[in-house]
Amino acid sequence: MAEVLSIDELRERIDVIDNQLVRLLNVRVACAVEIGKLKHELGMPVYQPEREKKVLEKVKQSAQQLAGPLTADAVVRIFERIIDEARRAERESGSTSEDFGPLIGE
């Protein structure tokens, strides 16, 4: 028989997951900022819509394969926001490039 967890236990579990998500999001954005710096050094535009499209397609496919309670479209919307915030972090990191592309969520 499956263990029945209390609301408090489930909330504690969510708190742990939230902390893991925040840590992973910060690692992801730090990587994106570093990529942005390298693109600047190489004279490449920061905003590369084809790469973003590829990322969104990959996460949509992953969401479809995992078939959890979040729809694939919901996962795509979440990642659109993550990409927006990564681009915002690149801007705030002091990159001089003007080509950051549009913010999806604005």
Walk through the language-model features, giving the residues of each:
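Domain-level signature for soluble enzymes in the chorismate/prephenate branch of the shikimate pathway
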Residues: M1-E106
